[in-house]
């Protein structure tokens, strides 16, 4: 580690291979907590690069639990979190609608860290076994076209990094790595990101990881979701090209929804919100969900524009298809 620390202290970027080698040791519990904290803080001060992000992701995937069946067409819409918006579980709600639209969703997530209810917490209330075995996850992906991929189950070696992250108490490169470390080789991705200035770096990492198409979204006030107030900024990876764009609720012909109107609660309250959306009950929650689903369909290529994606989202909720996906997952991922 001495040579690595020296290189970082000289503000020299690390190669993918260097970072992957360091994390391979970390994930084998061969590096002390203080060294891990120093490494993460050093990268943060220097400024993280796409190669460094990719190196960590590849190390994590090499230590991840493997599913018995291979899927090459999956998508994830997991975000970084950490935006302090305290909104309801938007991407978790959206994943059922995306799956209803024919996209195989490998929805990664975790328990609450900075909010009252993480994706794992709300799905548990709904009777879904978030810690299901790899065999059950494969069955769900095959039969339902949707599975919840629990970070703690699929990345057990991450426990060696947790204490250092908690001791630091600030966002590090690990916040960027989480949504990218899905154990499946994703074809497409919608990733919420809490800092606009990191979008290009993350987009380059996503490209290196082999995604066919992806959108990285940062909402107003650095939300890691799209919102119906202010300006949303997204970076699109398409056909090997990376470009940045903006849009507002007015561009889509939608009504304004303030952040205070989509505040979430605890896991039980957020489960009720999720159900109300899938039942097509009119609310700011429904409007925010269809916006993010529309963006997901655009990220996947299922819709040519975000607006087309929003219309498809409305249809799938209105006809009960999205709610049916939840019912099927409740039957299979148990």
Curated annotation (Swiss-Prot):
Binds 2 magnesium ions per monomer. It catalyses: N-(5-phospho-beta-D-ribosyl)anthranilate + diphosphate = 5-phospho-alpha-D-ribose 1-diphosphate + anthranilate. It holds the Pfam family Glycos_transf_3. Anthranilate 1 binds at residues 79, 110. GO terms for molecular function: anthranilate phosphoribosyltransferase activity; magnesium ion binding. GO terms for biological process: L-tryptophan biosynthetic process. Pathway: Amino-acid biosynthesis; L-tryptophan biosynthesis; L-tryptophan from chorismate: step 2/5. InterPro entries: Anthranilate_Pribosyl_Tfrase (IPR005940), Glycosyl_Trfase_fam3 (IPR000312), Glycosyl_Trfase_fam3_N_dom (IPR017459), Glycosyl_Trfase_fam3_N_dom_sf (IPR036320), Nuc_phospho_transferase (IPR035902). The keyword Glycosyltransferase applies. One of its GO terms (cellular component) is cytosol. Mg(2+) 2 binds at residues 224-225. 5-phospho-alpha-D-ribose 1-diphosphate binds at residues 79, 82-83, 87, 89-92, 107-115, 119. Mg(2+) 1 binds at residues 91, 225. Its EC number is 2.4.2.18. Anthranilate 2 binds at residue 165. The keyword Glycosyltransferase applies. Its cofactor is Mg(2+). It is an enzyme of class 2 (transferase). Keywords: Amino-acid biosynthesis, Aromatic amino acid biosynthesis, Glycosyltransferase, Magnesium, Metal-binding, Transferase, Tryptophan biosynthesis. Catalyzes the transfer of the phosphoribosyl group of 5-phosphorylribose-1-pyrophosphate (PRPP) to anthranilate to yield N-(5'-phosphoribosyl)-anthranilate (PRA). Belongs to the anthranilate phosphoribosyltransferase family. PANTHER family: ANTHRANILATE PHOSPHORIBOSYLTRANSFERASE. Homodimer. This is Anthranilate phosphoribosyltransferase. It comes from Streptococcus thermophilus (strain ATCC BAA-491 / LMD-9).
């Amino acid at each position: 580690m001495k040579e690595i620390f020296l290189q970082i202290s000289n503000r020299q970027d690390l190669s993918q291979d260097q970072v992957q080698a360091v994390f391979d040791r970390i994930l084998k519990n061969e590096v002390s907590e203080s060294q891990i904290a120093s490494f993460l803080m050093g990268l943060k001060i220097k400024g993280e690069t796409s190669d460094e992000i990719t190196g960590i992701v590849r190390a994590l995937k090499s230590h991840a639990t493997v599913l018995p069946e291979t899927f090459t067409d999956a998508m994830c819409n997991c975000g970084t979190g950490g935006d302090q918006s305290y909104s309801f579980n938007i991407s978790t709600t959206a994943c059922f609608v995306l799956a209803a639209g024919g996209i195989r969703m490998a929805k990664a997530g975790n328990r609450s860290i900075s909010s009252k209810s993480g994706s794992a917490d709300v799905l548990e209330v709904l009777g879904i076994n978030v810690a299901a075995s790899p065999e059950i996850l494969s069955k769900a992906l095959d039969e339902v076209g949707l599975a919840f991929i629990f970070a703690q189950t699929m990345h057990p070696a991450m426990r060696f990094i947790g204490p250092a992250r908690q001791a630091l108490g600030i966002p590090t490169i690990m916040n960027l790595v989480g949504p990218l470390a899905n154990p499946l080789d994703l074809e497409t991705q919608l990733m919420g990101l809490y800092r606009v200035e990191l979008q290009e770096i993350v987009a380059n990492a996503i490209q290196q990881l082999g995604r066919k198409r992806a959108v990285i979204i940062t909402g107003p006030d650095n939300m890691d979701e799209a919102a119906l107030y202010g300006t949303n900024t997204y970076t699109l990876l398409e056909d090997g090209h990376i470009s940045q764009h903006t849009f507002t609720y007015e561009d889509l012909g939608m009504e304004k929804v303030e952040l205070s109107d989509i505040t979430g609660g605890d896991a039980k309250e957020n489960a009720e919100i999720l159900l109300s959306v899938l039942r097509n009950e009119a609310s700011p929650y429904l409007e925010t969900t269809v916006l993010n689903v529309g963006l997901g369909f655009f990220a996947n290529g299922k819709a040519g524009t975000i607006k087309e994606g929003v219309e498809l989202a409305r249809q799938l909720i209105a006809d009960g298809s999205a709610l049916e996906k939840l019912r099927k997952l409740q039957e299979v991922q148990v």
